[in-house]
Amino acid sequence: ELEGILITHEHVDHIQGLGVFSRKYEIPIYATPGTIAGIRNYKKLGNLPDGLLHEVDIDQPFSLGTLNIDPFAISHDANEPSGYRIDNGKKVVAVATDLGIYDYTVEHLKDLNAVVLEANHDIHMLEVGPYPYPLKRRVMGDKGHLSNELSGKLLCDILHDDLQYVVLGH
């Protein structure tokens, strides 16, 4: 059973099917106030009933069923983007994607059992690839995306014996 949908930020590649899915199954959506404002501004989602949208604040844990969820700030070019640390009392997982930089994110990623971590691009391939220069600059910027190399460094910073699963994603 799905008790809620956690949204990290309002970019289209993260919310494209949110309207239809949430309305069809009446599943609550949880996101920061800035992200919810961005979701409401994206007209292609259609009308989302206010009762389905729930604001969560950075560094203010909340409960969803048996889960304790701790939203944390991330560096990305969106309205108040977040990652999530999720604890069921036995295991702790985190979602940290769309990171431009990760310096202040590391503390939220310590002592995990599993993590979904961004590994977005090979720097050389991005530099010589077909994207226009402004997009390349955005992707490599402090509010863009984490390179594969920096993702590896972050993983080394949080690695410990109980970290059993690492899922690389965008």
Which residues are covered by each model-predicted region?
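Active-site metal-binding loops of divalent metal-dependent hydrolases
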Residues: E10, G34, I74-D77, T97-L99, ...
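Hydrophobic packing residues within well-ordered alpha-helices of enzyme cores
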Residues: L18-F21, I39, T105
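Cap/insert and terminal regions of metallo-dependent hydrolase folds
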Residues: Y104-G169
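Glycine/Thr-rich phosphate-binding loops of Rossmann-like dinucleotide-binding domains
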Residues: I15-Q16, I39, H124-M125
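Short, conserved SAM-binding/catalytic segment
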Residues: Y42-P49
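Short, charged/polar "capping" segments at the starts of alpha-helices
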Residues: T35-N41
